[in-house]
Amino acid sequence: MITIERVLEILKADANFRHIKQNDQTDSTWTDVQFDALSYDSRTVSPMTLFFAKGLAFKKEFLEKAIEAGLAFYVSEINYEVGIPAIIVHDIKQAMSLIAMEFHGHPQKQLKLLAFTGTKGKTTAAYFAFNILKQSKKPAMLSTMNTTLDGKTFFKSTLTTPESLDLFAMMAEAVKNGMTHLIMEVSSQAYLVKRVYGLTFDVGVFLNISPDHIGPIEHPTFEDYFYHKRLLMDNSRAVIVNAGMDHFEVVKEQVSSKDHDFYGPTSENQISQSAGFDFTATGKLAGHYDIQLIGGFNQENAIAAGLACLRLGASLEDIHTGIAQTNVPGRMEVLTQQNGAKVFVDYAHNGDSVKKLIDVVLEHQTGKVFLILGAPGNKGESRRKDFGLLLNDYPQIEVILTADDPNREDPAAIAEQIRAHMTRTSNFILDREEAIRTAMSQTSSPKDAVIIAGKGADAYQIVNGEKAAYDGDLEVAKQYL
């Protein structure tokens, strides 16, 4: 429950209030109204809902339908002149976050908050942290892959970082469930559209940075992308940063006055010895660790999570056990065919993560290697060039381009945009399942491998804005073992 008086106080304190408009009347105050729900979905309103009219695709007709359902008040940057009072603000997204925070009783104050950002590795690092903290704490987790608000029941996530109304509702539920910690992935988009506006994290972790999410509906430039990634550092009480990341000196300077730990090359916290399924660390986490996820980058993610959890009350024993227990759906999952050939399923979906995936596989598989790859439609358009240029560096790999969440674009046209930057041959098979079957049928020995990149554990394809039925890469591959 929240009163309109409190709503207006919050907006005015944030310098985000313009006025209240109803017909020809303009006001700066209002009294005697209470709201028992918040919503940005015009299909889920009641007379006591405070509704937020947001988004480029929002239409006046949505508001009119909500009024038919009894809506009596809304917040907007625009006066839609629909006959009910409108609280006009400068920034609707800022308003949503601060009002949701208040409506749910500031649940963040009752949780220790850990956030991961980076171009890749956020989900893996979040899972490491979850498994570490669950040894002696009660963590909830919001990840790109799955969400748990009670530490036991998992459900599929819709966004890397939820909309602020959903985020604070989830936090409140986690508190109600007795959780003590919350692990989150915080995307650059979350800061771009202010889903975490006003929120301070106890520990923020910056894993890495490389060009991604650059396009008409995301970030216009790499500089803008990097800036929004770095905002997590400004909004965290303590930070963990990868000393081996590109542009590290920029971040190092930014966090110099904060409580911080660095890990990786040139830092105290390094991996001194590394094998496929174990590694040895120096510094605060000094010791030997078993790990299920192969690849040096996964070992670095484990170190980042361990350092963060150490600051949040985990013991070294918790960290050892949690790292050893961690596996992640759709991340470096390995199947073995009857002929001994390996199938690697991974969520790698940008140039840098695909390169690391290929390099790890080539360390272990010396025979014929197939790569199944696509690029999503209507987002991350810079990936297409990145993929094309990257694949030129691996002429020994057989490449099959295919559909990967084409959305409202033609998968064949996306493949041609990738090919435009390639100086080598590749095949195109529209149907993703057929592409997987074809590649697996052409392997013949334990030295061979099929790499299926992009979708990980996603059991759908995004086509024309909807989630179309698809079994998922891992399940499809299992059918042809």
UniProtKB/Swiss-Prot annotation:
Catalytic activity field: UDP-N-acetyl-alpha-D-muramoyl-L-alanyl-D-glutamate + L-lysine + ATP = UDP-N-acetyl-alpha-D-muramoyl-L-alanyl-gamma-D-glutamyl-L-lysine + ADP + phosphate + H(+)
Pathway: Cell wall biogenesis; peptidoglycan biosynthesis
EC number assigned by the record: 6.3.2.7
GO cellular component: cytoplasm
Motif L-lysine recognition motif location, chain numbering: 404-407
Keyword Transport: no
Similarity section: Belongs to the MurCDEF family. MurE subfamily.
Gene Ontology MF annotations: ATP binding; magnesium ion binding; UDP-N-acetylmuramoyl-L-alanyl-D-glutamate-L-lysine ligase activity
Any Gene Ontology biological process: peptidoglycan biosynthetic process
Keyword Membrane carried by entry: no
InterPro entries, per database record: Mur-like_cat_sf, Mur_ligase_C, Mur_ligase_C_dom_sf, Mur_ligase_cen, MurE/MurF_N, UDP-N-AcMur-Glu-dNH2Pim_ligase
Protein name: UDP-N-acetylmuramoyl-L-alanyl-D-glutamate--L-lysine ligase
Compartments in which it is found: Cytoplasm
Sequence positions that bind UDP-N-acetyl-alpha-D-muramoyl-L-alanyl-D-glutamate: 42, 160-161, 187, 195
Function: Catalyzes the addition of L-lysine to the nucleotide precursor UDP-N-acetylmuramoyl-L-alanyl-D-glutamate (UMAG) in the biosynthesis of bacterial cell-wall peptidoglycan.
Pfam families the UniProt entry points to: Mur_ligase_C, Mur_ligase_M
Leading EC class: ligase
Residue list for modification N6-carboxylysine: 229
Binding-site positions, ATP: 118-124
Transmembrane intervals: none
